[in-house]
């Protein structure tokens, strides 16, 4: 049984012999995602350390700047950028720890590191350092939070200490390599390029694990430019159990509004003809969309049940199509077939409001707002009985929609 931290004895012989080091390293590598996050943070800090170390020499040699105020002022902008990037990262992680933005951060850091040695003006490089800081915040906030979130409480202190240990080892090694390369004549430009390739490794490491979250992050960023989405009832979506989402269908973007606040991927049912559109098919297949057609209806429902039995989230629009009259149309009974199978989870009704009159909606009610952000409301209501009929569900949502 694990001893509490206050009852553990520190033994010097074990420390000198490397027993504690081996034990702690084994602990931080036990969960692969934690280890990947630690490696990513270590690579990031190594890049940052080297860039800050060589920029002074680069500015003197290639920009002919000897006044340290300009050099230090440019690098100080990275610090302001980290603050700004951290605030933005927190905003993008308001529903869950969005590690997808770390991939965006890695992309930005890598591109800037490659770009700096090709620029000959401090007036251009200084704003790039600000952006470097913003992208750094995108990396630091979600990955650091993710390490703490994934770590067992009993070992959190050890894992955080191990995280700092690994990061410092990486930074020391990279500074030693920088000194070594500089000693043998590699100039600052080449070192920038070398750090750019380290950034490529960082991007690849994060892309292996968070590429799907990254794509959803891009969707969310694009949507936020035009829509302000307000959610209600997110507490009705369990973190782990299977969920069957059923609700109205008002626009082509309903799938996006449902997915944004949920870290778990939603398995949508979609018309088979749209599913097989050449440009969309690879994306929809990768997104585990379930194709639906009159002939293959039962097979689609059985596949939905299999996903639910695995604990996934499945979403169905019982209206069968996007509404053309801005009202909730009669619900089809097809989803009732799912109730004839056993699966452990909840049935959660939802209602989407605010897209009427949008270019992505079929109903036009005069509520066009071409110059303003549109406010969209998405409500997840309390779970209902799995045996609920299509008519009962339709009436329930019609009653509850006024609370949204």
Question: PLM features: residue spans?
Answer:
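Loop-to-transmembrane helix entry/capping segments in MFS-fold secondary transporters
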Residues: 68-69, 151-163
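A single, central transmembrane helix in multi-pass transporters
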Residues: 26-84, 138, 172
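C-terminal ends and interior cores of transmembrane alpha-helices
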Residues: 107-121
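Cytoplasmic membrane-interface "Motif A"-like loop-to-helix N-cap segments
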Residues: 91-107, 188
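Juxtamembrane intracellular "pre-TM" segments in multi-pass secondary transporters
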Residues: 3-38
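Helix-to-loop junctions at the C-terminal end of transmembrane segments
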Residues: 84-98, 182-183
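Catalytic core of membrane glycerolipid acyltransferases/transacylases, capturing the structured
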Residues: 239-296
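A cross-family acyltransferase "interaction/gating" segment
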Residues: 326-391
């Amino acid at each position: 049984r694990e001893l509490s931290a206050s009852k553990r004895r520190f033994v010097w012989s074990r420390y000198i012999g490397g027993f504690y080091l081996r034990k702690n390293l084994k602990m931080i590598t036990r969960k692969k995602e934690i280890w990947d996050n630690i490696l990513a943070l270590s690579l990031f800090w190594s890049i940052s350390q080297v860039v800050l170390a060589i920029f002074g020499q680069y500015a003197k040699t290639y920009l002919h700047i000897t006044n340290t105020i300009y050099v230090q002022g440019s690098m100080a902008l990275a610090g302001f950028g980290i603050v700004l990037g951290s605030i933005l990262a927190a905003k993008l992680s308001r529903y869950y720890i969005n590690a997808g933005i770390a991939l965006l951060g890695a992309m930005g850091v890598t591109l800037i590191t490659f770009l700096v040695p090709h620029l000959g003006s401090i007036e251009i490089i200084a704003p790039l350092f600000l952006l470097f800081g913003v992208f750094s915040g995108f990396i630091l906030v979600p990955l650091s939070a993710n390490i703490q979130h994934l770590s067992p409480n009993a070992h959190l202190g050890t894992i955080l200490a191990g995280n700092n240990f690994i990061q410092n080892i990486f930074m020391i090694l990279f500074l030693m390599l920088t000194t070594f390369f500089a000693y043998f004549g590699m100039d600052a430009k080449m070192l920038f390029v070398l750090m750019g390739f380290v950034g490529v490794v960082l991007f690849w490491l994060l892309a292996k694990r968070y590429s799907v979250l990254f794509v959803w992050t891009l969707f969310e960023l694009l949507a936020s430019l035009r829509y302000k989405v307000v959610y209600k009832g997110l507490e009705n979506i369990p973190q782990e159990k299977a969920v069957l989402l059923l609700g109205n269908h008002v626009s082509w973007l309903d799938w996006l509004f449902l997915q944004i606040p949920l870290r778990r991927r939603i398995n949508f049912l979609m018309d088979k003809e749209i599913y097989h559109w050449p440009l969309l098919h690879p994306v929809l297949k990768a997104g585990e969309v379930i194709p639906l057609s009159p002939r293959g209806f039962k097979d689609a429902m059985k596949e939905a049940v299999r996903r639910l039995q695995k604990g996934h989230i499945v979403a169905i629009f019982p209206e069968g199509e996007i509404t053309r009259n801005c009202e909730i149309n009669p619900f089809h009974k097809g989803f009732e077939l799912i109730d004839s199978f056993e699966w452990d989870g909840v049935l959660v009704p939802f209602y989407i409001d605010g897209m009427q009159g949008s270019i992505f909606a079929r109903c036009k009610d005069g509520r066009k707002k071409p110059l303003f952000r549109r406010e969209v409301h998405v409500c997840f209501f309390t779970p209902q009985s799995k045996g609920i009929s299509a008519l009962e569900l339709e009436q329930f949502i019609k009653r509850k929609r006024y609370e949204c």
